[in-house]
Amino acid sequence: MFKSNQKTRYYEYLIKFNIMRILDKNDIKLKLLIAHGSLGKFFHLKEFSEALEKLGVKTMLVKDSDFSTGFPSKRPQEWFGMNKKFIDLINEFDPDAVFIDRQSHFGIDTIKSKIPLFILLRGHYWSEIEWAKKTLHKGPVIKTVLWFRNKIAEECFRNATAVLPICKYLEDVVKEHHPNQSTFPFLEGIDAERWYNVEGMELKHPCVGLLQGADWWGKTKEMLILKKVMKELPNVNFYWVGDGVYKDKIILELEKFENFNWLGHLQYPEKVREFLSEIDIYALVSGMDLAPLTLKEAQLMKKPVIATNTGGISEMMEHEKTGFLVEEGNSKDLIDKI
């Protein structure tokens, strides 16, 4: 976690000693084109862009699909063509490098344009794709779409200038799949000054708050241990903020308990701040996580935190000092910590 000036200094280190070293540039006055994928991560890349501007780096932040599309997509008219918008964007901004946060046609077009490409990797892509094959993508059409998307992702990973995983655990994973690729951890800090207590939303106490998505079964399935936890702790209320393709599957199992409440999606950061202000304990119940921002945010709000000891979580917190780690699948351990 950083205060604003600390965060800016960290990004200065990142630019000077990693990106500029790879680009073989001695002057920090470079032009970086930043492309975001999901709207949920726009806020953080905007902060990144603003911090770099303070250092003299000229940046432009765009949505990747506004400028670069192709097969597979839901709109057949996007399957063919030269992505003229992308070409015009490059000609207009003339970047020294491109920074993306998902593997997409924007990355492929950057590689074809022979512009240095840096990929911010937040998730365990290879585990996600395997779980998608097992759980979501069983029909021939969807399997074909998944094959093409994986082909795009692997081409991005293989031909990028560098891949920037958000923790050391994930860097090791990248090296397993692409041992010759340049990597360095991108510690995605957050501005500590944004996370302060406000008047919270109305919740029943005592309560445990969960703030996590449900788009990947390998990660989401761990939430099912809450059935045993809520049964043993009927007087503790559990509030889940999150959404995703497995939302209904989780709710179907957990709504059987009167002490479970699903709050859906909350506006970020204002409503999330209200939620974190009110809860008594923050819990991250996950089958795989790397360096989740919500865990950092809860810690900044001075909330007791409990998290599954998986992925890169142990890099973020020290057991029994800055929070409690519980082993995956161990509902008794989670009950005891609560």
What residue spans do the PLM features occupy?
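Conserved donor-binding/catalytic core segment of Leloir-type glycosyltransferases
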Residues: L33, G200-K221, K227-K231, Y239
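Acceptor-binding helix/loop patch of EC 2.4 sugar-transfer enzymes
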Residues: F67-P72, I119-K151
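Membrane-proximal helix-turn-helix segments that form the acceptor-binding/catalytic region
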Residues: K84, D88, I142-V163
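Donor nucleotide-sugar binding/catalytic pocket of nucleotide-sugar-dependent glycosyltransferases
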Residues: E154-N197, H205-C207, L211-G213
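Nucleotide-activated donor-binding/catalytic signature segment of Leloir-type glycosyltransferases, i.e.
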Residues: D248-L266
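Aromatic "clamp/platform" in nucleotide-sugar-dependent glycosyltransferases that forms part
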Residues: G287
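Short hydrophobic beta-strand element within catalytic cores of glycosyltransferases
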Residues: P304-A307
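Conserved acidic donor-binding segment of nucleotide-sugar-dependent glycosyltransferases
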Residues: H319-E320, F324-S331
